[in-house]
Amino acid sequence: MTDNNKALKNAGLKVTLPRLKILEVLQNPACHHVSAEDLYKILIDIGEEIGLATVYRVLNQFDDAGIVTRHNFEGGKSVFELTQQHHHDHLICLDCGKVIEFSNESIESLQREIAKQHGIKLTNHSLYLYGHCETGNCREDESAHSKR
């Protein structure tokens, strides 16, 4: 049994071809933060005939099962990434949609300190920082970031 088959079974999901193919694409580093529409286009490009409705349904199932994490970045478009064991935060370009993951212990420590000052014990958090690429011409290069 492959690792992907085990992952699906451990999540309580039946092993189906669409689920396996979508999981394979999500494991590609170039598809780290991907929308349902972009995932659908990638599947078409590699010759997989999986409908857009199926892609949405599988991503929702994966989200419910904890296999993927859904992010609703500025602009209203959901993007998905495989759920990771390590915590990280995100920088997002408002022009091209580029997503950069980062970890910074100073930020994490400050968040815990602020929560403690207010009598809150943190269990989870999300930090999204929005801005614009310094190059200034990233809109022209939008396709380079659409599959991240």
From Swiss-Prot:
Record: residues binding Zn(2+): 33, 81, 90, 93, 96, 101
Keywords on record: Cytoplasm, DNA-binding, Iron, Metal-binding, Repressor, Transcription, Transcription regulation, Zinc
What does the UniProt function comment say about this protein? Fur acts as a repressor, employing Fe(2+) as a cofactor to bind the operator of the iron transport operon.
Provide one Gene Ontology cellular component: cytosol
Family stated for the protein in its record: Belongs to the Fur family.
MF terms (GO), sorted A to Z: DNA-binding transcription factor activity; DNA-binding transcription repressor activity; transcription cis-regulatory region binding; zinc ion binding
Q: Which CDD domains match?
A: Fur_like
The gene it comes from is: fur
Q: Name the cystine pairs.
A: none
- What protein name is recorded for this chain? Ferric uptake regulation protein
- What is the protein's major site of localization? cytoplasm
